[in-house]
């Protein structure tokens, strides 16, 4: 859609913008139009306008757990992580906009003596992405603390609880409705000792730093297979260091696929499929991707 329509409809957007600049994997072709709304109202207006003119909409959060294909994304891409970070605390309830960063929420609530989100320090993503994926770490997950989320669906804002959202392991009903958009979410917390909570966060942060590679990756590539861990399975299959193009199975943690510099989405997808095939052949284990793939080849 390069006939000037997008420029007329969304003058505040960036056009033909390389999305590798906005993803943790440093991979991704161009967005026809990339909009970073400064308010929820601007977001609502953009989605409504896109719908009226038949412009497809893709929403990105913090760029983790997502692979943008090399052909980029057609239509309008909306990135939430830049501005939609509003947060409000009322008693033991936290309400955060979709672009708020999970580690920031973990630190903020811990410092105020509110427990429940310490696990979020290990999730380098946004509220919107965390609800979409039911993100979790260190024995907890979003579903355990989520009260509700406001979802833009079919032109209306609908408040949905955890059951309505169908939260399960790294999944929600949002996977089946790519046009739905998380606007904000509320969390039920409980009192805790600030120093104890901060110490727990420090421990989680140390675990993450020691167990994660220092090269660009999307985070966890595959979901946990029943009764096991994907990193252990991939390592047991002898696949650490396996490489396609500039994408490599990390030698630090085998469930992280790292970009050595200049890697492409096609490299990443080929490596993911190769790892799945070899794990299946050698160990009889079926790995399911955790990463969300968007865009065109």
UniProtKB/Swiss-Prot annotation:
Q: Which cofactor does the UniProt annotation name?
A: FAD
* MF terms (GO), sorted A to Z: FAD binding; UDP-N-acetylmuramate dehydrogenase activity
Q: Which Gene3D superfamilies match?
A: 3.30.465.10, UDP-N-acetylenolpyruvoylglucosamine reductase, C-terminal domain, Uridine Diphospho-n-acetylenolpyruvylglucosamine Reductase, domain 2
Localization annotation: Cytoplasm
Pathway assignment reads: Cell wall biogenesis; peptidoglycan biosynthesis
A Pfam family: MurB_C
Catalysed reaction, written as an equation: UDP-N-acetyl-alpha-D-muramate + NADP(+) = UDP-N-acetyl-3-O-(1-carboxyvinyl)-alpha-D-glucosamine + NADPH + H(+)
Superkingdom as given in the UniProt entry: Bacteria
Could you tell me the EC number(s) of this protein? 1.3.1.98
Q: Which UniProt keywords apply?
A: Cell cycle, Cell division, Cell shape, Cell wall biogenesis/degradation, Cytoplasm, FAD, Flavoprotein, NADP, Oxidoreductase, Peptidoglycan synthesis
Q: Where is it predominantly found?
A: cytoplasm
The active site of this protein is located at 170, 220 (proton donor), 290
Q: Which family does it belong to?
A: Belongs to the MurB family.
Query: What's the protein name?
Result: UDP-N-acetylenolpyruvoylglucosamine reductase
Native organism: Rubrobacter xylanophilus (strain DSM 9941 / JCM 11954 / NBRC 16129 / PRD-1)
Q: Which gene encodes it?
A: murB
């Amino acid at each position: 859609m390069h006939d000037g329509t997008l420029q007329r409809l969304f003058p505040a957007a960036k056009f033909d913008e390389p999305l590798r600049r906005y993803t943790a994997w440093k991979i991704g072709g161009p967005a026809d139009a990339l909009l970073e709304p400064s308010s929820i109202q601007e977001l609502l207006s953009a989605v409504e306008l896109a719908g009226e003119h038949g412009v497809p909409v893709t929403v990105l959060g913090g760029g983790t757990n997502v692979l943008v294909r090399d052909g980029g994304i057609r239509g309008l891409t909306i990135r939430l992580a830049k501005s939609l970070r509003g947060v409000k605390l009322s008693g033991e309830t936290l309400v955060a906009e979709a672009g708020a960063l999970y580690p920031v929420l973990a630190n903020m609530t811990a410092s105020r003596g509110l427990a429940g989100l310490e696990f979020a320090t290990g999730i380098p993503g946004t509220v919107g992405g965390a609800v979409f994926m039911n993100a979790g770490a260190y024995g907890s997950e979003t579903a355990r603390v989520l009260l509700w989320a406001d979802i833009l669906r079919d032109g209306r804002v609908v408040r949905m609880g955890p059951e309505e959202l169908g939260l399960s392991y790294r999944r929600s009903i949002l996977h089946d409705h790519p046009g739905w958009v998380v606007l904000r979410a509320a969390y039920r917390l409980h009192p805790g000792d600030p120093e104890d909570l901060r110490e727990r966060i420090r421990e989680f942060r140390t675990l993450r730093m020691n167990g994660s590679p220092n090269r660009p990756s999307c985070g966890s590539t595959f979901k946990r297979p029943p009764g096991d861990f994907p990193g252990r399975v991939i390592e047991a299959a002898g696949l650490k260091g396996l490489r396609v193009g500039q994408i490599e199975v990390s030698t630090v943690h085998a469930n992280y696929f790292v970009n050595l510099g200049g890697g492409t989405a096609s490299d990443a997808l080929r490596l993911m499929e190769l790892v799945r095939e070899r794990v299946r052949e050698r160990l009889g284990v079926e790995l399911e991707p955790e990463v969300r793939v968007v865009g065109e080849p």
